[in-house]
Amino acid sequence: MIGTIRIFLVVAAMVALSLSLIPFQYLFLKLKNGWKRRLPNFFHRIVARLFGFRIRTVGKLHEGCPLLLVSNHTSWSDIVVLSAVGQVSFIAKSEVRDWPVFGMFAVLQRTVFVERARRGKTVHQTSEIANRLIAGDAMVLFAEGTTSDGNRVLPFKTALFGAAHAAIREAGVAEVAVQPVAIAYTRVHGMAMGRYFRPLVSWPGDVELMPHLKGILREGAIDVEVRFGEPVFVTAETDRKALARTMENRVRALLQSALLGREIPEA
């Protein structure tokens, strides 16, 4: 009963919040105002509180040059968590654009939609991401290309790492920062999740979204740790596949450090 009441209250608050802020975001996008980056961050900080996410950050977003963030991917909730931590936009599969409600939010946050299966579009897609990097947008790449169980990092796809090189090539910038990020769901109601309970938040592709969303809303009080690693500064000479391997190893080390509660050196 308590869980049902909590879901109702959170949904009601979300509807009120969304109806209040969505018109402003449309306006900021039309005017190309700087608040087009700030408002999603503000919105998701409130959403994270409503959902019961208690976020702890280790390290910080790199500043000073074009930034591509490379993260592990456990659940749809990663979007809320990272958006609450910083002013970021995402790189997502094209299907997300057509999802009810969530697709609209993705568009409002200026997500770049990609078709991973169509290799012929890779050059165009990396160029689009590069243009956003050049414009000063911190872009998040979930390089696994799918969601994991939250206990491990899956092998990284390498194609979209080419966006860093495209930014250098097209804008003549000297370097692009590529920064590893790990999102770890560690506790629920103060109790360590462990491997057995982490599927509470992990969202594999064969699970329907709405039942999973209700499960998280019913629980609340979920501790999340976001770890930012040291960036790699990419130049025109940097090998794309070697960069992807480095990021995969670093994200894996950051995730294990958060889950185990002890530092594991980045590769």
Curated annotation (Swiss-Prot):
The Swiss-Prot or TrEMBL record annotates one GO molecular function as: acyltransferase activity
Sorted alphabetically, the Gene Ontology BP terms of this entry are:
lipid metabolic process
Topological type in the membrane: Single-pass membrane protein
Which Pfam families does the protein's record reference? Acyltransferase
Q: What keywords would UniProt list here?
A: Acyltransferase, Lipid biosynthesis, Lipid metabolism, Membrane, Transferase, Transmembrane, Transmembrane helix
Q: A Gene Ontology CC term for this entry?
A: membrane
Kindly list the residue ranges recorded as spanning the membrane. Answer: 7-27
Q: Is Lipid biosynthesis one of the keywords UniProt gives this record?
A: yes
Under catalytic activity, the entry for this protein gives: a lyso-ornithine lipid + a fatty acyl-[ACP] = an N(2)-[(3R)-3-(acyloxy)acyl]-L-ornithine lipid + holo-[ACP]
**Phenotype on disruption:** Deletion mutant lacks ornithine lipids but synthesizes a component corresponding to the lyso-ornithine lipid precursor. It does not affect resistance to bactericidal peptides or permeability of the outer membrane.
- Enzyme Commission identifier(s): 2.3.1.270
Main subcellular location of this protein, as a coarse class: membrane
Q: In which pathway does it act?
A: Lipid metabolism
Compartments in which it is found: Membrane
InterPro entries, per the entry: Plipid/glycerol_acylTrfase (IPR002123)
For this chain, the family text in UniProt reads: Belongs to the 1-acyl-sn-glycerol-3-phosphate acyltransferase family. OlsA subfamily.
What functional role does this protein have?
Answer: Catalyzes the second step in the formation of ornithine lipids, which are phosphorus-free membrane lipids. Uses acyl-acyl carrier protein (acyl-AcpP) as an acyl donor and converts lyso-ornithine lipid (LOL) into ornithine lipid (OL).
Query: Mind telling me what this protein is named?
Result: Lyso-ornithine lipid O-acyltransferase
Species whose genome carries this gene: Brucella abortus (strain 2308)
Report which gene this protein is encoded by.
olsA
